């Protein structure tokens, strides 16, 4: 068998006896430079690959550092924001009456209770109905008869009763005395009084006793106004005599200690008046006096830019209503009240 050797120029095997076989195509003068041994090619490729990998690693490290810096900057920013917000919240809580509330630790109450939105007969539960249910729960706590008609069952009052046991520490005994629109909801043997107030909404609006929702006739009689006074004249009277009117509403609301239940906020608190609020007329503003506003049927009363109360004079109903934004008045005058969470 004829031996063959490798021609380094062409990269082809040729016979040892000198036979060239097929004619060799030399082509371009630079073709020889383009023919590299596999070993050299591998070296060059490995070098290129190492350089590329090193470059990629450097870029990756730079990118990682950049991303990490961005992440840590974001974390620091969020921490600063959190600290700032926390400081604001803390300051607000110190100023607010609810700093008192939180000191009482409302979480001590193990039983949470929210009264159903429906009556037993399937109708919508009104605020007045919730008030009767709440009074019934107090009657059950003190084992005293509920005075007046009651048609809402005992299941909901029993749930609320479990939240009220701490009330016994403040009023060892109570009797229900709310029949016929009486001034006091509950009375003790030594003539101490307790008023029960409820709200089904977050804003916590409550009306004063007796004069909070009177007929137009009774409103006019109470404030010694002519019986033929028009609604527009009543509105004008309210605006001109607002401090006097608020003083009367305050007396008929806060003369008694108040047991207050807000169903939406799921909170029950005992509120005792320490001193009468002195309303500054310069801080009072009627919402209807703001640009683009008017007093049609209702208007919001602001005090120091916070909602204090709401007046309602309906054209279709002969009544003059006023309701406090109850929790707001506690916030506005924290030194005037002692608040205890039950």
UniProtKB/Swiss-Prot annotation:
Comment on activity versus temperature: Optimum temperature is 23 degrees Celsius.
Keyword check for NADP: no
Catalytic activity: Endonucleolytic cleavage of DNA to give specific double-stranded fragments with terminal 5'-phosphates
pH profile of the protein: Optimum pH is 8.5-9.0.
Induction: Expressed in the late phase of the viral replicative cycle.
GO terms of molecular function: type II site-specific deoxyribonuclease activity
Keywords from the UniProt entry: Endonuclease, Hydrolase, Nuclease, Restriction system
Gene Ontology terms describing biological process: DNA restriction-modification system
Annotated EC: 3.1.21.4
Domain of life: Viruses
Protein name in the entry: Type II restriction enzyme CviAII
